[in-house]
């Protein structure tokens, strides 16, 4: 089974695809979609086109998205919600469903502590997947963590 984990952002959208087979997790690919255009419509289109390419290329079975966190800037939250809405619609069209996890759920699943720092989550991602190189930016390790969290939830059900 292939799981796509997404950490949506207003400038960078982290993604990771992991394989979950025979109780073993392995990283297939990870990166981020850089959102560089200035018009919102173009940003959404760029994001959706990149998602389409990932879904086509890697034959994803499951998708998990990190939920919106609390932010002090209402404009950022609204923009992020628009991106998530567009991502959600495309995923529903292509896959049929998706799961959502809060940052607290992801941190707790990987570290046992819902208030863990991003660096602790990145450390556990590397440890669980036997990754020796540095994972930068942290949007990528967050996306991997979302995918791992979903794989753990699937094992429980």
UniProtKB/Swiss-Prot annotation:
Keywords: Cytoplasm, DNA damage, DNA recombination, DNA repair, DNA-binding, Endonuclease, Hydrolase, Magnesium, Metal-binding, Nuclease, Virulence. The active site is at residues 7, 66, 139. GO terms for cellular component: cytoplasm; Holliday junction resolvase complex. Binds 2 Mg(2+) ion per subunit. It catalyses: Endonucleolytic cleavage at a junction such as a reciprocal single-stranded crossover between two homologous DNA duplexes (Holliday junction). Mg(2+) 2 binds at residue 66. Its main location: cytoplasm. It is an enzyme of class 3 (hydrolase). Coiled coil: none annotated. One of its GO terms (molecular function) is DNA binding. Mg(2+) 1 binds at residues 7, 139. The keyword DNA damage applies. Transmembrane segments: none annotated. InterPro entries: RNaseH-like_sf, RNaseH_sf, X-over_junc_endoDNase_Mg_BS, X-over_junc_endoDNase_RuvC. Its EC number is 3.1.21.10. One of its GO terms (biological process) is DNA repair. Homodimer which binds Holliday junction (HJ) DNA. The HJ becomes 2-fold symmetrical on binding to RuvC with unstacked arms; it has a different conformation from HJ DNA in complex with RuvA. In the full resolvosome a probable DNA-RuvA(4)-RuvB(12)-RuvC(2) complex forms which resolves the HJ. The RuvA-RuvB-RuvC complex processes Holliday junction (HJ) DNA during genetic recombination and DNA repair. Endonuclease that resolves HJ intermediates. Cleaves cruciform DNA by making single-stranded nicks across the HJ at symmetrical positions within the homologous arms, yielding a 5'-phosphate and a 3'-hydroxyl group; requires a central core of homology in the junction. The consensus cleavage sequence is 5'-(A/T)TT(C/G)-3'. Cleavage occurs on the 3'-side of the TT dinucleotide at the point of strand exchange. Required for efficient infection in a mouse model system. Belongs to the RuvC family. This is Crossover junction endodeoxyribonuclease RuvC. The gene is ruvC.
